[in-house]
Every structure is written in C-alpha cells, then in structure tokens.
C-alpha cells in the first residue's frame, strides 16, 4: 500500500546563472569641424549602461550602450576639451536551465580599454566590457513533513530558511531641467558625468513596497572661455517609487539592487539664450527581491513497525539568506603628482570599484580596489592628468557562517593638497554584505507498506549499546517505537552518552 504523506510547498530562488560575460565594443569618432585638433588625450571615461534584459527559453539577451567621454588637450594645452559619443552593444548568455518567469540583473564594467588618437581629428576606441550577470527563477518543491499513520515511525528535521515571494525588475524615468546656480559660467561641453542612486527607505506593504531615495548627479563641464578652468556642478533628483509584487506583505524582507540604466545629459538654453540649464534624463532599473523567513520541516527517515517497508528519498538544497546592515569604510591614500608640478586640483573622482567577500579563520573580510582619477593644473598653467589604483582589505567579525557576497559604492571622495607633489585622497565606501547559508537536506519522496507481510511476533530483547549510538538507529534496527525504548530505559537523550544495555520491547 502506498503511504500518503502530508506535504508542504516551498518556494525558493534558484540561481540559474552567475558569472561574467565579455562583450567587445569597438568604435571610432571623428571630431566635428568646430572642435579643436587633438594634441594629447588625457582620459577616456567609459560608462556602460544596460537598457534591457530579456529571457527566452534558456537564453538571456542583454542590450545596452557604452557612453564615452574623451578629455583631450589642444595645441596650447591650457584648457580641457572633450567630446562624447555612445555605442550600442548586445550580449547573449546561455542559462544553465530553462525556466519560466526568469529575472536577471546585469552589472556592466570596463575590463579593458584602449583609446588612441589616429590623427588630430580621429580617435579609435577598443573596449572590452564585462557583464556580471545573475539570473534567478523561483523553484517550487513539495516537501513531506509528516506521515499520519500509527504503523510508521518518522524522524523529522527543521530548517530556518528563506522563502521566495517574488523577484521584480522595476524601471522608471527621472527627468529634470537643472539650472546652474548664479555666478556659474554657461556650459559649452559636458566633460564628465556620474550618477549614484541612493536608497533611503524601503517600506513593505501589501502587494509590494514603497521605495524612496535620490539620484546624485555630478557634472564637470567646460565653459565657452579658452582661459577658464572647467567647473563642477552637482544636483539631486529625489524619487518615490511603488514596486508591485503579488503575494508580498508587510512581513517581507526586501533586497534591492540598483542598476544604472540610461543616462543622458544635454545643455539647454535658458530664457536669455545662455546654456545654463542641464536636461537630465535618467532611467534606472531596480532588481527587487521579496522574501520571507520560515521554517521547513522534512521527513528525513522513516520505518514501519509492522510489515515490509520500502521508501525513496530525495536530496534537497535549502537556503537561508541574511542581508547584513550596511557598513561604511574609509580609505585614505596619497596620490603622487609627477615632477612636483601641482598648482590646482580641477577634479577628482573614483572609478572601477571591485569588491570580493571572503572568510579568514573566524573573521569575515572584504577585499576591494578602485582607481582615483586626478585632473589638475601644473605650475606652468598646463592641464595634466594622473591616476592611482588603491586597494584595501576590511576585516570584521563573522557573526554568521556561510557563502558571502558583497555590493558597494563610493559615496564621496575628498582631498587635501599636502604639497606640490602629493594629494591626500579620502574615499568613503558603503558596503552591504549578504550571507547564504545552504542546508543539504534529505526528504521522503514516496513510501510503500506491504500489508500482506505477516507481522513479527511479540518479542523482547536486550541490546548492549555503545556510547555514541543513536536511539533512533537502535529503534529502527529492531522495528520498535522510539517512545517505547525511551520509556523502558528511562532514556531521554538522542545519543547515548555511555555504554549500556538497552531493553527493547516490541508488541
């Protein structure tokens, strides 16, 4: 007779892809007639943007564009000039499995880049982008949690796990005309643009969540004067978004990954015809995971006290994900300027942040590196550029043991000029770690009891058990009830602490 089991459905996130995909981007740019000739390229700033991610079958398609700002000097070398261009790209990823309702996030970064002036009017750019891709699907498992039959003894285990409610990709548009403050010179060319999205509050509610935050925009631009230095401008675009997810509630835990998306910055004329307005068009995408904490109970072993017993088991992988509170790290290093030739810092920024989380003995650690970029003016009134890669390791106590991952961003960078050859740079980082605890569980899949088999006659026995033996194993060997062995031997422990005789009575 096939035994009926009570089952519980468990929904968990299954990661069907986690890796880095390379994507080449090659382009060339010819300066318009109104631009000055290139004497020297100072810096090429590449900002890759993912515009869409779509799944079909076991294939994932990622579309985006690489936004490039090239800073260069003309023959005089006394002012920064620049141009910008964009190049679209498409990348395909083969998933490990075909699944429905796949959600994926792709974080682009620059792996390698060459920017070369072929002549005074043309620039060749060869870029290799890396796409850090993570794709998820919700897997549904039926787990046996008990057998309601007095002829069967069951052994159960409980796991505190994370239940998947849903994963949502949420894109929205932020658009604003930002006016320069009084006293700022009009804009001729945007030389550098960076956008950082900051999440301030996340409020779960029935059917989704309300997310508030802001987009922090920094601009370096060139004025219409060949003798004036480039100027900086920053602004904030606040946002409030409602993210919908079926089945979500106030008891959900929410994790948000902010993907940059599209970014377009265009100077616009004001009412008197001067370019003192910046039109900002941003289209960020949030990858929002909704989860709930729960307890899963599995029947990991069973046997019959009457009749022949045949059971089939399956192995399960259950997970508990813990998002640790954000941590701030300060990295302070010196950036050296060649030939003691520093007069003025025109701009400083950081790029290329990479983070790796790992464990070291009883501690958790995050190893990271990023590049500090410095645009400055020399004592001879010439414009120059230098950069330095900084690395750091942050060690702290590991309160939870598991597979660690980390996300982070540089929230601010400050500097102090200590002398004509040294700039002391201080970068503030915000990091958020996630710990995945994986449980290898065993669960009953099916079982049959042969009722035609004659039950064994009543018997009593004495078994001489060794220290360390489990009461369950002894009861299973003799097809006896665990409760009877505990009662007859006055033994409440699961594992015997000493050698002793065990009375076994089976009715």
Regions found by a protein language model. Name each.
Residues 1-455:
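Interfacial loop/beta elements and low-complexity acidic/Ser/Thr-rich segments
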Residues 52, 201, 460-461, 471, ...:
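Residues at structural and domain junctions
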Residues 448-464, 469:
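Strongly charged, low-complexity linkers/loops
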Residues 465, 471-477, 482-487:
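Short alpha-helical segments in extracytoplasmic peptidoglycan/chitin-binding modules
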Residues 480-507:
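Extracellular LysM carbohydrate-binding repeats and other cell-envelope/extracellular binding modules
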């Amino acid at each position: 007779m096939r035994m009926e089991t009570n089952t519980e459905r468990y929904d968990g996130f299954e990661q069907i892809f986690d890796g880095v995909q390379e994507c080449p981007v090659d382009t060339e740019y010819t300066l318009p007639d109104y631009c000055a000739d290139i004497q020297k390229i100072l810096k090429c700033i590449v900002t890759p943007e993912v515009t869409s991610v779509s799944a079909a079958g076991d294939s994932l398609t990622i579309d985006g564009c690489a936004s490039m700002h090239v800073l260069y000097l003309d023959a005089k070398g006394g002012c920064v000039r620049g141009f910008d261009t964009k190049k679209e790209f498409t990348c395909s990823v083969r998933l490990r499995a075909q699944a429905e309702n796949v959600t994926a996030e792709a974080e682009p970064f620059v792996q390698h880049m060459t920017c070369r002036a072929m002549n005074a009017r043309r620039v060749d750019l060869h870029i290799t982008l890396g796409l850090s891709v993570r794709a998820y699907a919700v897997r549904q498992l039926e787990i046996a949690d008990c057998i309601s039959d007095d002829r069967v003894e069951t052994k159960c285990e409980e796991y505190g796990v994370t239940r998947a409610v849903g994963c949502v990709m949420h894109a929205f548009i932020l658009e604003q005309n930002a006016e320069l403050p009084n006293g700022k010179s009009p804009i001729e060319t945007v030389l550098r643009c960076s956008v950082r999205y900051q999440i301030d509050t996340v409020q779960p509610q029935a059917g989704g969540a309300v997310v508030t935050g802001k987009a922090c925009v920094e601009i370096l631009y060139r004025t219409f004067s060949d003798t004036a230095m480039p100027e900086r401008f920053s602004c904030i675009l606040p946002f409030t978004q409602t993210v919908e997810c079926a089945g979500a509630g106030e008891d959900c835990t929410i994790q948000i990954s902010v993907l940059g998306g599209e970014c377009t910055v265009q100077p616009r004329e004001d009412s008197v015809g001067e370019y003192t307005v910046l039109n900002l068009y941003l289209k960020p995408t949030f990858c929002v995971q909704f989860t709930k904490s729960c307890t899963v109970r599995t029947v990991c072993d069973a046997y019959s006290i009457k009749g022949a017993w045949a059971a089939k088991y399956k192995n399960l992988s259950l997970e508990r994900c813990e998002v640790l509170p954000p941590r701030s790290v300060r990295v302070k290093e010196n950036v050296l300027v060649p030939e003691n030739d520093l007069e003025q810092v025109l701009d400083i920024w950081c790029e290329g942040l990479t983070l790796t989380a790992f464990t070291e003995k009883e501690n958790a650690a995050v190893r990271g590196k990023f590049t500090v970029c410095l645009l400055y003016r020399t004592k001879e009134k010439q414009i120059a550029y230098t950069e330095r890669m900084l690395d750091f390791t942050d060690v702290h106590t590991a309160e939870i043991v598991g597979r660690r991952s980390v996300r982070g961003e540089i929230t601010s960078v400050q500097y102090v000029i200590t002398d004509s050859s040294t700039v002391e740079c201080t970068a503030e980082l915000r990091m958020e770690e996630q710990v995945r605890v994986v449980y290898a569980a065993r669960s009953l899949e099916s079982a049959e009891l042969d009722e035609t088999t004659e039950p064994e006659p009543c018997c009593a026995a004495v078994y001489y058990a060794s220290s360390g033996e489990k009461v369950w194993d002894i009861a299973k060997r003799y097809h006896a009830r665990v409760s009877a062995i505990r009662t007859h031997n006055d033994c409440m422990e699961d594992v015997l602490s000493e050698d002793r005789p065990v009375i076994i009575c089976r009715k």
